[in-house]
């Protein structure tokens, strides 16, 4: 689980848009950039090179 206060202040480093936490995949997802950032051991890895590109369908479903 990610601290809700932390989630309130984190934004996508690429688009500066808000992030949505997906508990199933342990990722922070950004609809605007289409990137999903991993959360490892409760720590968000907010590096573009570590992000996974989501499919258009996945990004639109957010």
From Swiss-Prot:
One of its GO terms (cellular component) is cytosol. Gene3D superfamilies: 2.20.25.10. Belongs to the UPF0434 family. This is UPF0434 protein ABO_2103. It comes from Alcanivorax borkumensis (strain ATCC 700651 / DSM 11573 / NCIMB 13689 / SK2).
């Amino acid at each position: 689980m990610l601290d809700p206060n932390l989630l309130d202040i984190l934004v996508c480093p690429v688009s500066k848009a808000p992030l949505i936490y997906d508990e199933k995949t342990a990722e922070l997802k950004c609809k605007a950039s289409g990137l999903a950032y991993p959360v490892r051991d409760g720590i968000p890895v907010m590096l573009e090179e570590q992000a996974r590109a989501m499919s258009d369908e996945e990004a639109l479903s957010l």
